[in-house]
Amino acid sequence: MLSGAFKTRLFHPMQKIGFAEALDSIVKSDPRYERDAYIFLRDALDFTTKQQKKVKGTSVRHVSGPELLEGLRQYALKEFGPMVMTVFDSWGIHSSGDIGNMVFNLIGAGIFGKTEKDSLEDFRNVYDFKEVFVKPFAPEKPAMTRARAELPAPKPAASRK
């Protein structure tokens, strides 16, 4: 999906567009997602490639959609903890499909690369946001519910004469 994490696109033979300029253009043409969301996505890609390098022992040249989503999930939980959904909502991100839309916006701008096998479908319904970002912080339900302790009935008050 994302070969050459920070590719640049040639608009003129002598002029390359940088990440900041690409974001300006993307956010202007597709205002669904905030600029900070794209910066976070780039950072999540870096995190993912570093994690894969630790596991595989060599540099990673390509990250698939599901691999990026798993790395993004881990990175988001690390960075934002229980506030992930609040942050993502403020950025316009509500599903794994939104991440795919952002990735393909960056591909279109020449910032991320892709292979012929990569598609938006790689990002559709990969995981449920509430399941992966809210559930880890939800209080655990006890394994067994205890029978509620019954209090003895109150004794009638003695009448005073």
Placement of each model-derived feature along the sequence:
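Non-transmembrane, aqueous-exposed alpha-helical and coiled segments at domain scale
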Residues: 2, 6, 11-161
